[in-house]
């Protein structure tokens, strides 16, 4: 609730009117927990994006998006890797952009497609059964989620979910500095949330 409030409050104040900043960062210690929370938060972000589109005069034209930033074993680092997985229906790759399987609204399976001209992964609800009932299918051309590192760097998400081990790499990944408002015209986040703080020990905890 606090995160969504901050997103809309900032837009009402025009703070993010001309920026590409990440406003909320939530960090988890366990990758499995991060993936689980990603599917839950996706429904909230989709609802927020629908609300923004319906009230663009108040909240601006910039899309409200959700990003997932975890290890390479879970999600691809590059768009080209993600496109190969999506374009090959028989792919058994463990690293995949398909981290959200079902539509948060109607629960039907989502369709992932690769858009090479913009290096973008489109995520759509196209189920015929929910054509007239699914708010996401009716109001969003593509779900506002990003699961490929390259796409995250090029289009900073409004809300970023990350694991602390991935986040620790920010000191040697110049392209990731945008998440903290340290690159280009991006603004720093309004809120950083660390989940399960007591689990962070040793050098990793010191670094993060």
Per-region residue spans from a language model:
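N-terminal helicase ATP-binding lobe
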Residues: 1-208
């Amino acid at each position: 609730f606090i995160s969504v409030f901050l997103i809309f409050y900032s837009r009402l104040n025009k703070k993010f009117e001309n920026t590409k900043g990440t406003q909320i960062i939530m960090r988890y210690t366990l990758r499995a927990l991060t993936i689980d929370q990603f599917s839950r938060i996706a429904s909230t972000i989709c609802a927020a994006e629908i609300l923004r589109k319906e009230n663009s005069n108040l909240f601006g034209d910039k899309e409200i998006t959700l990003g997932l930033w975890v290890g390479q074993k879970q999600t691809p680092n590059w768009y080209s890797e993600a496109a190969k997985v999506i374009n090959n229906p028989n792919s058994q790759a463990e690293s995949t952009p398909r981290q959200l399987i079902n539509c948060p609204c109607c629960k039907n399976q989502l369709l992932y497609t690769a858009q090479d001209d913009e290096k973008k992964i489109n995520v759509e609800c196209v189920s015929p059964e929910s054509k007239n009932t699914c708010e996401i299918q009716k109001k969003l051309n593509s779900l506002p989620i990003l699961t490929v590192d390259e796409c995250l760097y090029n289009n900073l998400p409004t809300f970023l979910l990350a694991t602390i081990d991935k986040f620790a790499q920010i000191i040697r990944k110049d392209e990731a500095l945008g998440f903290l408002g340290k690159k280009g015209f991006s603004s720093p986040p309004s809120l950083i949330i660390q989940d399960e703080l007591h689990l962070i020990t040793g050098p990793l905890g010191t670094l993060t």
